[in-house]
Amino acid sequence: MKVIVTKSYDETCTVIANLFRDLIVAKPNAKLGLATGGTPVPIYKKLIAMNEAGTLDFSGVHTVNLDEYCGIDGTHDQSYRYFMNTNLFDHINIDKNNTFVAKGLGDFEANARELEAKVYEGGVADIQLLGIGNNGHIAFN
């Protein structure tokens, strides 16, 4: 593990966005583990700006998100699929068929198996973005 100390949240977001950029440039078919919530939004904005500037190409990238709310469809404004579309996917040149957010409706056990398969399909994520909450939680747990 590498620990990087920064002076501000904005600097932290810039460092993280640059880590993602460097990975994608080096490995255009990178697999990204992504997160939802407030923490990653500024990072996503920086990645969008890089894509819009033509310095970052998401066309070969694959993504996996690790959670979704049960009982709501991906078009619901509280779903994580909706969050990812609104905050990142709709603004970059990624093939949405290469993005995975677990289903919130249907057979939850089958959905969990599908999520597990996607996590390991083609190897684990090359990089994983997770938030740390003010109460110490990591990711959504």
List the model feature ranges, each with a label:
Residues 17-25, 48, 52, 85-89, ...:
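Generic structural signal for well-ordered alpha-helical scaffold segments
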Residues 6, 10, 14, 41, ...:
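Electropositive phosphate-/nucleotide-binding environments in soluble metabolic enzymes
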Residues 34, 128-130:
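Redox-cofactor binding/interface segments in oxidoreductases and associated redox assembly factors
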Residues 56-128:
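Ligand-binding beta-strand-loop-alpha-helix segment within the catalytic cores
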Residues 135, 139-141:
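Class I SAM-dependent methyltransferase SAM-binding "motif I" and its flanking Rossmann-like core
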Residues 1-32:
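N-terminal glycine-/serine-/threonine-rich phosphate-binding loop
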Residues 26-51:
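Glycine-rich N-terminal segment of FAD-binding domains in flavoprotein oxidoreductases
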